[in-house]
């Protein structure tokens, strides 16, 4: 039996998704699978799991999850996703809920217990299936204990001796930080409770444990990997990251162009390509009509924002400068939800500038596609951005971004006025700098249509493929001395 790369994740599109993590885990494992790498994914069986297109079946009943004090069981379901197995850990008391991590009252009180259980259940499933993986690849705090458990299991259990671990950090700000008493019930050995392990200012930090014990740690862009080594972006974990700097790598995410490409997008009223951009103008007119914007905006630039309405995404900067933008006779579309104060303010501005500003406080996948296609300029004023996917989508849709020069935004956008420019960036994350960059973009759109069309075509030619990212991860696995696909013992 060939040894697999097994991905541990709390989300995987199309089965579950709350943000970019789901997109990544719907694409990267599949890219490796298509490259001939034996690959599997393990994820929770949520109450609102989307399985209509991929029927699931019970594959393991009463899988025993070993805890020091008592056995707990779970059922495991399986789906065939384009020939790749996806396993779903089912235990109703933990995962049969409307949302993944929180509701309107806040984070679920038992999140630590839920995801400690998931990590232990994944390891129990591998045992039950009888074949140790070549690589266990965990993602974010929810699965960060997989590398930690593996580190200690390798010391006592020959089954795991040749398995290596990778932890990918998609956003360092979300760490899974809990009360210290929950460490005692996690099943980690006492020696893991240290400043070089799971302990963080007296709390139990799941992400820190994963960073400490994973064989390799990755982030989702080279720039972000450098940024998190310092206090400005390190979210308190820059110390442990510097200690593990030799094991830290930045690998840029890819974009799923099977889904996000204007040449084959089923959500668009008209498709288009770099050699035939007429469809983009038609998408713009259709979007103006759909959202009830003033028809004259077909002859003016439309600025699109898609993202969570939270401080990290810089939505407050956009709201601050929006009245000033109205003086330039542009349209603004905001799609997203998040902080209630930002939501209310965005809706108030829509009322104040009705016909020129449209705020949709929700997220729908189909409308996101149409905004990418129908906008002229995409706004991404993130205070930090580990990688970012929406700017990659904007580039492919010929919608040059205006973005902060941080993290993955720095790695994916060539800024104006370079002859190879694909967008606009600004250095200081503040309203004045953001406004200047937008006005530069509006000026180019208005006064130099030939230069603008050149930028649009260069943007659409960018290719941040998952195959490229997959090859980088295979190189990383090779550094660990493992070759997925080799026959196991």
From Swiss-Prot:
BP-aspect Gene Ontology terms: glycogen biosynthetic process
UniProt keyword annotations, A-Z: Glycogen biosynthesis, Glycosyltransferase, Transferase
Family according to the record: Belongs to the glycosyltransferase 1 family. Bacterial/plant glycogen synthase subfamily.
Pathway: Glycan biosynthesis; glycogen biosynthesis
Role played: Synthesizes alpha-1,4-glucan chains using ADP-glucose.
CDD domains: GT5_Glycogen_synthase_DULL1-like
Protein name, per record: Glycogen synthase
Binding residues annotated for ADP-alpha-D-glucose, in chain numbering: 17
InterPro entries linked: Glyco_trans_1 (IPR001296), GS/SS (IPR011835), Starch_synth_cat_dom (IPR013534)
Enzyme class, spelled out: transferase
